[in-house]
């Protein structure tokens, strides 16, 4: 009896199904890289709930205005922390197209690394200090949307924000209204009048907080 006799062998049907699955996954990767796939589906296991388009555009408009206000340095740097769907809308702005702003996405979901390879940094809030040294204290504006409504998640995300932001960084935080006390104590933030909305009508009461006087929110 050979050493391989006890090793389970996959049936021909199983091998064919596995091969088909791998081919489909590779096709999706190639479509993401080529831009054929415009929208990445939510992964609820990662607590992903995408904004509706109006919310995305309003957050982007505020981020651009805040980044360019009071600073002549160009490009102004904007960081998106766990808010990947905003990237597409930043790309549509004239300020991005003309090089007035520079964008970096800090995100756990590597699918966005395929879609936005030059602007993507893999980020896990559980390891808040695992950040590229060259990006520390570089950002004028940070827009963050921690994936979970939990104190630990917000505390660690806030730690990352403090490391990434300049001393006068402007921060927009989108999270559940129940996190208001933590937002205030951790980053001296106040609730704005803007209420983010999600494409799939997330049931939680959601709010936008800022550590500065916002420019475009009524």
Curated annotation (Swiss-Prot):
InterPro entries assigned: DNA_methylase_N6_adenine_CS (IPR002052), Efm5/EEF1AKMT1 (IPR019369), Mlase_EEF1AKMT1/ZCCHC4 (IPR041370), SAM-dependent_MTases_sf (IPR029063)
Top-level taxon of origin: Eukaryota
Top-level EC class as recorded in UniProt: transferase
Family: Belongs to the class I-like SAM-binding methyltransferase superfamily. EFM5 family.
Main location: cytoplasm
Coiled coil spans: none
EC number(s) stated in the UniProt entry for this protein: 2.1.1.-
The keyword Cell wall biogenesis/degradation is annotated on this UniProt entry: no
GO BP term (any one): methylation
Any GO MF annotation of the entry: nucleic acid binding
Any GO CC annotation of this UniProt entry: cytoplasm
Location(s), subcellular: Cytoplasm
Designated name of the protein: Protein-lysine N-methyltransferase M142.8
Keywords from the named record: Cytoplasm, Methyltransferase, Transferase
Entry function: S-adenosyl-L-methionine-dependent protein-lysine N-methyltransferase that methylates elongation factor 1-alpha.
């Amino acid at each position: 009896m050979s050493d391989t006799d006890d090793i389970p062998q996959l049936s021909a049907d199983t091998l064919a199904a596995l091969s088909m699955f791998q081919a489909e996954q590779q096709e999706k990767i190639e479509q993401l890289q080529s831009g054929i796939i415009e929208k990445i589906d939510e992964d609820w296991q990662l607590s992903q709930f995408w904004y509706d388009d109006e919310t995305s555009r309003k957050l982007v408009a505020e981020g651009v205005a805040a980044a360019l206000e009071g600073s002549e340095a160009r490009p102004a740097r904007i960081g998106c922390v766990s808010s990947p769907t905003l990237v597409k809308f930043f790309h549509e702005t004239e300020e991005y197209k003309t090089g007035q702003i520079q964008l970096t996405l800090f995100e756990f979901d590597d699918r966005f690394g395929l879609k936005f390879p030059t602007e993507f940094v893999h980020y896990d809030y559980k390891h808040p200090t695992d950040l590229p040294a060259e990006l520390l204290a570089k950002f004028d504006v940070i827009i963050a949307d921690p994936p979970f409504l939990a104190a630990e998640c917000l505390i660690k995300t806030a730690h990352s924000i403090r490391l990434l932001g300049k001393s006068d960084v402007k921060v927009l935080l989108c999270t559940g209204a129940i996190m208001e006390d933590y937002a205030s104590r951790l980053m001296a933030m106040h609730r704005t009048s803007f209420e983010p909305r999600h494409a799939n009508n997330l049931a939680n009461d959601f709010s936008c907080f800022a550590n500065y006087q916002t420019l475009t929110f009524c």
